[in-house]
Structures are given as C-alpha cells and as structure tokens.
Amino acid sequence: MKKYILKRFLQLIPVLIGITFLSFAMMRIAGSDAITELYGDKGAVAQEIIDAKRAELGLDQPFLTQYLAWVGGILTGDMGISYISGRDVFQTFVSKLPATLLLTVLAICATVMISIPLGVLAAVRHDKFTDYFLRFFSFIGNSLPNFFVALLLMQVFSIHWSIFPVISNGTTVQSAVLPTLTLAVAMSAKYMRQVRATVLEELNKDYVEGAKARGVRGRVILWKSVLKSSMLTIITLLALSIGSLLGGTAIIESIFMWDGVGKLAVDAITMRDYPLIQAYVVWMAIIYVMVNLITDLLYHALDPRIRLGVSEA
C-alpha cells in the first residue's frame, strides 16, 4: 500500500511538468499577453512604457527562460505576482478556495440525496410508471445545458419571486442555493441513470435470488447487499464530479458572480494573467491525481479483490 501511494505521488511530477509546459506554450501561442490586455494596442500608451512594463514582468524573455523561472519560484514557494491585480498569486488563489469548497460540498450532498434514492426507486419499479417518469426526468436533466438551468432558476427565484439574491457573494448558504441547484440538476440526472442501471444489474444476479429463497426481506437485500455492490460505480462518478467541482465551474460561477476558483480562472485567461493561469493549472493537476488516488484506495477498501498494482507493504 505504501509503495503504491508513493508511486502515485511520484507520477504527479511528470504530469505537472507536462501540463504546465503545455499550458505555458499555448498561452504564448495565443499571441497576446497581460500587458496588451491592460494597455490595449491602439496606441493610447507609448510603446516605450509598454516595453518597460513587459521587461519588468519578464515577458520579454524567451519562453523557456520564463518557464524555468516560474518553476524555480514554485519550488521555493513563490508562485509569483498577479500581472493585473499586483497581489501575491498564492494568496489570491487561496482566498477563492472557500467559496469553491462550499459549492462543491453542497452540490455533491444535493446530488447524492437526489440521485441515489431516485435511481434505486427507478430500478425497483423497473418498467412501471415510476420508472418511466424518472427516466424522463433524467433525460430532460441531461439535455438542458447548465447555463440555461442557471438563467431559468435566476429568472424564477431571484427576479420573479425575489427569494434568493441575483448575485451570490460566495460565502453564505443562501447565496449558494441557486448555484447548487443548477449543478445538482445535471449531476443528479446523470447519476440517477447510472445508479438505476447498476442496481438493476445487481438485482438480476444469482445472489439476490438466493437471498430471497432463504427468506431475506427484499428491503434488506436492497440496502445491505445490492447498494453496497453498486458503490464502486457511485464512487467513480463522485470522484469525477468532485475533481471538476474543486476546479471550479466557470460558467455557473460567472453567471451567479460566485467568487470562486472557476471565475478566477476565467478572469485570468481573459486578461492573460499567466501566473494565475499557471496556479490554476497546477491546482487542477493535483486535484485530479489526488482524487484518482483516493478513488483507487476506496475501491480496494470496498472490494479487497481489487489489487492496486503493487504488492502490499
């Protein structure tokens, strides 16, 4: 186990190098930088001032020199200074994490509470009205884009009924209701279909028939055996969703002005704020590697027959 965990952490190094290098290259290929976005290119500011500012930030250096300087800063705990705000990148990024963490926890909780019971119900009521109705709901939820759901909820609950604020501050549960519902609609629809399919597959297995023959109640079989066997699929979905949510949901955060990591990333990309963009890239890489590692460990805990690829230490 220890060797496996160490191996996965070591795998993070080439992943980070590859991802950061590619993102650095793509931003340069884009053809403009933060100075162009800040001062414009219409001649409003003297070219000498623009060149001096670009030299001050090191943007006049060769690409490889800039990249190595940034990597060296990371290794010493310095992620640089934001080109636009002038604030420390690490502090700026960390200040946005609480809002993203709050939205992640609420969205996952809402999704689990909606999708698992409904998915199980649809499987138990297979090919009956309840099943058809829930499958229709799932189809609609999967078909609607997040931005449309967000605007619809905002129109109804914020503008028409004035129950929730139009603009969220990213710190209170009340302001998180609409962003959470928006995310939960699509996620619940997807989860419900997967839970239904997995539970339905388990219900048709021989051990379920054997338990029924021994007189075990259907509800006990469902919640203690079938659902436990279905947990691997649910954990996989949760892992993917947690990774994307912790990376910030750019569209939803931008619509609701939710002051989280996703909105920060959009603003940084728009303004070509390289240090902030690179901080976001590193964060996403770390999140997905860690989520995948935790998922593998949970797989092994739930089903010891699953091997982790190395001998146990």
Residue spans for each PLM region:
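Alpha-helical transmembrane segments of integral membrane proteins
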Residues: 2-3, 93, 97-130, 146, ...
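Hydrophobic alpha-helical segments of polytopic membrane proteins
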Residues: 6-8, 13, 153
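Membrane-interface helix starts
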Residues: 10-14, 63, 105, 277
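Hydrophobic alpha-helical transmembrane segments of membrane transport/permease proteins
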Residues: 16-65, 162-178
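Hydrophobic alpha-helical transmembrane segments of multi-pass integral membrane proteins
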Residues: 17-21, 105-109, 148-155, 282
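Membrane-water interface segments at the C-terminal ends of transmembrane alpha-helices
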Residues: 22-29, 58, 72, 136-165, ...
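Peri-membrane helix termini and adjoining interfacial loops of integral membrane proteins
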Residues: 43, 151-163, 254-262
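An internal, D/E-rich "acidic patch" concept
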Residues: 59-116
